[in-house]
């Protein structure tokens, strides 16, 4: 429901959002068949991975023990595995849901 609301709210009109991305959700994204997550955008988080993990540690009700996908160790491994795909130490990945082009722009 939230996903559909975002798509409606970000329709390309006079004042529009340039791009809408979905993010990888540990222990949820992999259960979304047949619409599984397919990363197409990588952001280098090598310098901020430990800050991300410290922030996640504040959400004790969301954390689980390793090897659960939402354990701190699993999140670290996941970020490093995504990063390795682009020769980075760690990365956060996104999937483009919609990308609107400005006048004269061409798709990448």
Describe the residue ranges of each PLM region.
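Metal-dependent de-N-acetylase/amidase catalytic core
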Residues: 1-108
